[in-house]
Amino acid sequence: MHILVTGFAPFDNQDINPSWEAVTQLENIIGTHTIDKLKLPTSFKKVDTIINKTLASNHYDVVLAIGQAGGRNAITPERVAINIDDARIPDNDDFQPIDQAIHLDGAPRYFSNLPVKAMTQSVINQGLPGALSNSAGTFVCNHVLYHLGYLQDKHYPHLRFGFIHVPYIPEQVVGKSDTPSMPLEQIVAGLTAAIEAISDHDDLRIALGTTE
């Protein structure tokens, strides 16, 4: 498969974003997949246009977006995105939407059509912390996952799409002993394992849900 993997620019006055740092270190061939890479701005207003232009000028079987989830302690494939922008902080354009629909003609939610349980289990099988997430938040990460679902629904019926959140890396949590992090090389290994699990097969039917 031809897979586009995206990461984000730093945001919230940080100098680094582990999503893009990890994406840049991915091999260009992973398993049977050819990997292209794209850096996205942390901008509600810009990401849609960039994604639209990229998909219009290239054929991709899969788009997999990667984002930072500070405070998480695992690599977490996302199951679903919701049709809301509700930003706790401004984005890099100083834009802070509150309770705004992403697409007025879109569904209330879009589920990733990637094998998210198989991807999660593949991370775990590498001895790395992995978990299936049921919330991508309401910032630009959720926005991108939702927009990809919208494009698949309205324009690219054969497109497969998904999102993975990754933790901070250690240099982001210096002096913050209670904040989890993960070495960059482990994030790269986890993303590689997750990408290797992407296939045309049905997802695994295993218990990776939560009770709360």
UniProtKB/Swiss-Prot annotation:
Gene3D superfamilies xref list: Peptidase C15, pyroglutamyl peptidase I-like
Reaction equations catalysed: Release of an N-terminal pyroglutamyl group from a polypeptide, the second amino acid generally not being Pro
Main location: cytoplasm
GO cellular component: cytosol
CDD domains, alphabetized: Peptidase_C15 (cd00501)
Signal peptide: none
Cell location: Cytoplasm
Enzyme Commission code: 3.4.19.3
Residues annotated as catalytic: 78, 141, 165
One annotated GO biological process: proteolysis
Keyword Protein transport annotated: no
Cross-referenced InterPro entries: Peptidase_C15, Peptidase_C15-like, Peptidase_C15-like_sf, PGP-I_bact-type, PGPEP1_Cys_AS, PGPEP1_Glu_AS
Protein name: Pyrrolidone-carboxylate peptidase
Sample GO molecular function, one term: pyroglutamyl-peptidase activity
Enzyme class: hydrolase
The protein's role, per its UniProt record: Removes 5-oxoproline from various penultimate amino acid residues except L-proline.
Sequence similarity: Belongs to the peptidase C15 family.
Keywords on record: Cytoplasm, Hydrolase, Protease, Thiol protease
